[in-house]
């Protein structure tokens, strides 16, 4: 092929790729909002629009309840209600026989309304371990939740969660720590953060009620030996004193009974036998 023919073919291919014919008009479809988070049974307004001046047909595709609130040639405004699960809304328009669409992602959430903190045990010796547990019932989506465990202003532990089934779940974070002397003067607490920014929502925070430990000093082995010895001596003295009192009492009783016995026998002795 000659160089002229090669250049002609290249120009023709470039024209076909970059410059489509007038029967293939380029247009765009937009949806607002592109993503949004709503609570169960919630509703939202969705706007579908297009750059096509005279679209042939357009609308919103969804399995949920929808109402057309208003419309013009290039846009339609809907109310979508009774949203009970994550879903995708699809706006579509047809222009010159060609259809374009755009999706809106809707997420259902339940914010953390209750955060329960548990310390186990609540009475701990210095140097001994204890468990901090934070529990958040009925929250979703779990993959947007983070639980923070605090000792005073110090973050002891935080926990995130993987994607779970699209339903309210219970989230739990557990951390084992060692008690020190200052823990008896510190508040322990838990913070639940549900971050829905990536889903078109807000950030929700919920704190637990603060709790405190009761801390005591453990008794050393030498102290324990001294305590046991002292208790043993005191117990021995007590038992000895009780026994001595008992023996002394019996002795006195026998002495009294002996005197009374002689006198009684003397009274019973007939007069003839008395001196």
Curated annotation (Swiss-Prot):
Transmembrane intervals: 224-248
Q: Where is the Ig-like C2-type domain?
A: 41-98, 127-197
The residues on the Cytoplasmic side of the membrane are 249-275
Glycosylated residues in this chain: 47, 82, 105, 153, 176, 187
Disulphide bridges, residue numbers = 48-91, 52-95, 134-190
Q: Where is this region: Required for interaction with EZR, MSN and RDX and co-localization to microvilli?
A: 251-275
What is the annotated role of this protein in its UniProt record? ICAM proteins are ligands for the leukocyte adhesion protein LFA-1 (integrin alpha-L/beta-2). ICAM2 may play a role in lymphocyte recirculation by blocking LFA-1-dependent cell adhesion. It mediates adhesive interactions important for antigen-specific immune response, NK-cell mediated clearance, lymphocyte recirculation, and other cellular interactions important for immune response and surveillance.
Family, per entry: Belongs to the immunoglobulin superfamily. ICAM family.
Quaternary structure and interacting proteins, as annotated: Interacts with RDX, EZR and MSN.
Q: What protein name is recorded for this chain?
A: Intercellular adhesion molecule 2
